[in-house]
Structures are given as C-alpha cells and as structure tokens.
Amino acid sequence: MSLTNDQIVEALSAKTVLEIAELVKTLEEKWGVSAAAPVAAAAAGPAAAVEEKTAFDVILVDAGANKINVIKEVRGLTGLGLAEAKALVEAGNKAVKEGATKEDAEKIKKALEAAGAKVTVK
C-alpha cells in the first residue's frame, strides 16, 4: 500500500510531539542516519556570525568593602529576601540577573558598581 504525501502529513499531524520524536529515532536507527547533527552544524556557522547577542548575564564578581550597600542594591534589583541576597553577595561570581537586555544589564552594573561592587556583564 502506497501512501500519498497528503496522507502522511495528515497522519503526522494527528500525533503528539513525543510520538514524532520517537518516530524520528526509529527512522534514524532503521536507516542508519542522524537527522540532527548535519543540520545543526550547518545552521550554526552562518547564524553565529550574523547574530548579535541580545541576552546578557550580570555577574557579581566581588562585593567590595561596602557589602551592606551591595546587599541592599541586590535586594532592590532582584526582589530577593535578605538571606538570599546576602548569600548571593557573599558567594561571589554569581549571576545577579540572567538573560537581561543590554540596557538592563548596564543599568544593573552601574547600580551595583555605585554601591561598591565589582561586576561583569557576559
């Protein structure tokens, strides 16, 4: 029995994503191919050169001498409780904010540096 492309599309549309993923694995094993590796490698090269970073992580490197002001600033920026903010500040090299926009990351960096902390944006 030969299926048309429309029949195959209809059959696949009725399946869940997990069922489709399982089907892909089965086909890869049966045919001895890998669907993900060549496609991902080819797509990653050109896209990386053109793509500009849009999400930044603000890392608190060191609280400096004025730890209390830095803890207050971390609490204000993140909404963390006193204990959580203190633990974050004392640990060092921890992310204060992850996935921030460039503007937000710079604002957070300036605020923490004004409080006496050493901060990096990655």
Curated annotation (Swiss-Prot):
Key word Cytoplasm present: no
Cited InterPro entries: Ribosomal_bL12, Ribosomal_bL12_C, Ribosomal_bL12_C/ClpS-like, Ribosomal_bL12_oligo, Ribosomal_bL12_oligo_N_sf
A GO-annotated cellular component: cytosolic large ribosomal subunit
Gene Ontology molecular function: mRNA binding; structural constituent of ribosome
Keywords, alphabetical: Ribonucleoprotein, Ribosomal protein
Gene Ontology terms describing biological process: translation
Disulphides: none
Keyword Ribonucleoprotein appears in the UniProt entry: yes
Pfam families referenced in this protein's UniProt entry, alphabetically: Ribosomal_L12, Ribosomal_L12_N
Similarity-based family: Belongs to the bacterial ribosomal protein bL12 family.
Function statement: Forms part of the ribosomal stalk which helps the ribosome interact with GTP-bound translation factors. Is thus essential for accurate translation.
Subunit structure: Homodimer. Part of the ribosomal stalk of the 50S ribosomal subunit. Forms a multimeric L10(L12)X complex, where L10 forms an elongated spine to which 2 to 4 L12 dimers bind in a sequential fashion. Binds GTP-bound translation factors.
Record's protein name: Large ribosomal subunit protein bL12
Species annotation: Bdellovibrio bacteriovorus (strain ATCC 15356 / DSM 50701 / NCIMB 9529 / HD100)
Gene name per UniProt: rplL
